[in-house]
Amino acid sequence: MKIGFTYDLRSKHQPDENSPADYYGEYESGETVAGITGALTTLGHEVTQIGNITSLVKFLSEGKRVDLVFNMAEGRYGRTRESQVPSLLEAYQIPYTFSDSLTLAICLDKGRTKEILKLAQIPTPEYQVLEPETDIETTIAFPLFTKPLYEGTSKGISEDAIIYR
């Protein structure tokens, strides 16, 4: 099978002086990309390392195609960034691994995800979406656990994320 491999390399994303320590948390190392490529090749597949969404757009615009895309791309900008590659692949009717674009767009927004879970009556801990620099006024029991609203792969989470009264 011809498999395209999409990913975002750490080396292609440069932090600035205001970037958090976990800036690279969701991007792949060259070692990871090589390891996954090797594993797929060992299984008998022909693997094309495509890279990020910009490379995928070029790949597709040149008329190149694969049977399946192994998608690990994180996207780059905006709160629906993880859904960018799957959306493009859906438009080209190319199957891919992992979650679809709608699921990725919803789940990156933790507040929206919690709303959907509650509407579906799926048990989930109480939550509150807070704006920056606001006092915490809540009836939710302490300690609280805070997370960035639009991040994944544990970015922005440390022992400082626990708030005691």
Where are these regions (language model features)?
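Active-site nucleotide/adenylate-binding loops and adjacent lid/helix of ATP-dependent enzymes
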Residues: 1-4, 62-63, 105-165
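ATP-binding N-terminal substructure of ATP-dependent carboxylate-amine bond-forming enzymes
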Residues: 1-95, 108, 131-137
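Hydrophobic beta-strand scaffold residues
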Residues: 47, 95-96, 124, 144
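A short, structured active-site edge motif that brings together acidic residues
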Residues: 98-103
